[in-house]
């Protein structure tokens, strides 16, 4: 009787398929991907260890030198920025801060 895709019988059938049939394929895919990622991670770690063994002590000395040689200049994050709206606000504040002269009586 109900022929629309929103009919409860169609929705129930789709949910059964989703849980029973399609879920197996999804689980198998996730398992394959996770296994491959684990293997890649192990390969990367082994390559890193081999590189460190080849470089040996020289790598440790280079790291110490690079830390000592590069004291970075502190970047100030306070103050006015270069944006157009900041320039406008700054100019407006400068105008307001100047005292306006009043008319004096003679």
From Swiss-Prot:
Compositional bias segments (type: Basic residues): 83-106
Renumbered residue ranges of the record's region Disordered: 1-21, 52-106
Residue stretches of biased makeup (Basic and acidic residues): 62-72
Top-rank taxon: Eukaryota
UniProt xrefs under Pfam families: YBL028C_N
Polar residues bias locations: 1-12
CC terms in the record's Gene Ontology section: nucleolus; nucleus; preribosome, large subunit precursor
Note: Present with 6210 molecules/cell in log phase SD medium.
Family: Belongs to the UPF0642 family.
PANTHER family, per database record: UPF0642 PROTEIN YBL028C (PTHR28219:SF1)
Protein name: UPF0642 protein YBL028C
Organism of provenance: Saccharomyces cerevisiae (strain ATCC 204508 / S288c) (Baker's yeast)
